[in-house]
UniProtKB/Swiss-Prot annotation:
Known partners and oligomeric status: Homomer.
The protein's name: GTP cyclohydrolase 1
Gene3D superfamilies: 1.10.286.10, 3.30.1130.10
Organism: Streptomyces griseus subsp. griseus (strain JCM 4626 / CBS 651.72 / NBRC 13350 / KCC S-0626 / ISP 5235)
UniProt EC number: 3.5.4.16
GO MF annotations, alphabetized: GTP binding; GTP cyclohydrolase I activity; zinc ion binding
Keywords, in A-Z order: GTP-binding, Hydrolase, Metal-binding, Nucleotide-binding, One-carbon metabolism, Zinc
Organism lineage: Bacteria, Bacillati, Actinomycetota, Actinomycetes, Kitasatosporales
Pathway info: Cofactor biosynthesis; 7,8-dihydroneopterin triphosphate biosynthesis; 7,8-dihydroneopterin triphosphate from GTP: step 1/1
Length: 201
């Protein structure tokens, strides 16, 4: 069983309850007027429950789980990983939003850095939860600041939200950009350098 985690200090949640999720999906199918016992839907509740277990796996991880490996290389210039794929779920409508994240930091004066893949894994920890893009962006930045203790952090997330594309206002292709900037990267010149690297194609 996965240990419970605490989200934003608002209490803990336990391990994923696959049977309960399966029963809930079955009830949802009935609620929308479908027959969950017909051939095409008979296995759907189980499939959806297993999919949700994967999609929301970040609920049962902490950033410390992925930022475990650090190196003291004496590198004191910016480290930036661009175009990290983001797949997340809007907590308001439980439909996907997807796009890319750009994550950069200026290492501490000790030169402590983490593996590049760890930055992508950190994005996944927070993306694989019911989310809003603004909080996702902030959580990534705050985790890097608290765990790596760098001199500065910048996180830019650019996503298309299916809740805007397939329902409501129905504007497919519209993208939302959010950013979180901490420490020395708030200096206008340093921030401009980071943004020029992020926006370069």
């Amino acid at each position: 069983m996965t240990d419970p985690v605490t989200l934003d200090g608002q209490g803990s949640i336990g391990a994923f309850d696959e049977k309960r999720a399966e029963a809930a999906v079955r009830e949802l199918l009935i609620a929308v007027g479908e027959d969950p016992d017909r051939e095409g839907l008979r296995e759907t509740p189980g499939r959806v429950a297993r999919a949700y277990k994967e999609i929301f796996a970040g609920l049962y991880q902490e950033p410390e789980d992925v930022l475990t490996t650090t190196f003291d290389l004496g590198h004191d210039e910016m480290v930036l990983v661009k175009d990290i794929e983001v797949f997340s779920t809007c907590e308001h409508h439980l439909v996907p939003f997807r796009g890319v994240a750009h994550v950069g930091y200026i290492p501490a004066t000790t030169g402590k850095i983490t593996g590049l893949s760890k930055l992508a894994r950190l994005v996944d920890v927070y993306a694989r939860r019911p989310q809003v893009q603004e909080r996702l962006t902030t959580q990534i930045a705050e985790s890097l600041m608290s765990i790596l203790e760098p001199r500065g952090v910048i996180v830019v997330v650019e996503c298309e939200h299916m809740c805007m594309s397939m329902r409501g206002i129905r504007k497919p292709g519209a993208k939302t950009l959010t950013s979180a900037v901490r420490g020395q990267l708030r200096d206008p010149a340093t921030r401009a350098e980071a943004m020029s690297l992020i926006m370069a194609r």
